[in-house]
């Protein structure tokens, strides 16, 4: 199967019937040659808040009721990759907790290797990162409403997801196959807007995103072998143009950020406890929910 590169994706007829606005100017904005222009003197500092419920917390979302946390379970090839036993129960949960970590509500889903979540429109949107892939739309009583693949891919496999968010009635997906942030109408499931991932040799890992007053923050990081070698950063995009506005590196020995959400002007994240290439629970903040302050 041919995977479209960024130039092909933006130029090869995307606007012809797909309803997607191509951000050609954004495709070059994150190249390493321009990285110094956006690199900030600010730093991201992490502060632990509370431990997540059982399992691997791999996505977060904020609503008026509290904080939602998505559970990731490792099954099949993912369990083998991390040398873990196959779970007896493959159900992956979304927990609503208060700001002390007390569980207020649990929603059960059939998502697999959940790596993104949004909450909006009366539903939880759980994003799978292994077969059967796609986005699981589940109501607050754990009834599955739909299971649909990320748009612009094969009908049975739109690729993996590493983040999601809900804003103004639209679902945003961090689409790994497309290598960008894709805005989708949640009813028609038509793609509407696309922002290419920030592109730099030392930032090859992409995670979740959060809305911030007309801008979007996304977690990026480097491939490495352990927590001490990890250099995560926050990229800030202009949500209207896709232009990269700022790159903020985390302080050394910070928590390992996976999910991302905004709460009263502060970024909230989670440390799943597993990371490709690392020993399990190598991060000292494994399974913690934490706040990110920009200092």
Write out the residue ranges for each language-model feature:
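A short loop-to-beta-strand structural motif that recurs across blades of beta-propeller domains
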Residues: 92-95, 134-136, 180-182, 232-235, ...
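Short loop/turn segments that connect beta-strands within beta-propeller blades
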Residues: 98-101, 139-143, 185-189, 238-242, ...
């Amino acid at each position: 199967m041919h995977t479209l590169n960024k130039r092909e994706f933006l130029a090869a007829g995307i606007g012809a019937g797909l309803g997607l606005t191509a951000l050609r100017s954004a495709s070059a904005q994150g190249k390493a040659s321009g990285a110094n222009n956006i690199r900030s003197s600010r730093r991201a500092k992490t502060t632990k808040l509370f431990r997540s419920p059982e399992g691997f917390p791999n996505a977060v979302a904020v609503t008026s009721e509290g904080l939602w946390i998505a559970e990731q379970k490792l099954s099949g090839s993912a369990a083998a990759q991390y040398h873990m036993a196959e779970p007896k129960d493959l159900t992956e949960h979304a927990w609503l907790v208060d700001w002390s970590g007390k569980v207020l509500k649990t929603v059960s889903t059939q998502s697999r290797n959940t790596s993104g979540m949004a909450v909006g429109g009366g539903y939880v949107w759980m994003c799978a990162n292994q077969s059967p892939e796609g986005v699981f739309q589940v109501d607050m009583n754990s009834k599955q409403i739909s299971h649909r693949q990320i748009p612009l891919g094969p009908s049975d496999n739109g690729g993996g997801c590493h983040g999601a968010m809900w804003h103004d009635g639209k679902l945003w997906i961090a689409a790994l196959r497309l290598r960008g942030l894709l805005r989708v109408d949640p009813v028609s499931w038509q793609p509407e807007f696309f922002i290419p991932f920030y592109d730099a040799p030392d930032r090859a890992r992409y995670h979740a995103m959060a809305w911030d007053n007309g801008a979007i923050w996304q977690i990026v990081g480097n491939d490495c072998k352990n927590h001490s070698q990890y250099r995560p950063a926050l990229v800030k995009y202009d949500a209207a143009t896709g232009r990269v506005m700022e790159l903020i590196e985390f302080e050394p020995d910070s928590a390992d950020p996976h999910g991302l959400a905004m709460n009263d002007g502060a970024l909230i994240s989670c440390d799943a406890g597993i990371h490709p290439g690392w020993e399990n629970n190598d991060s000292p903040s494994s399974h913690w929910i934490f706040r990110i302050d920009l200092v």
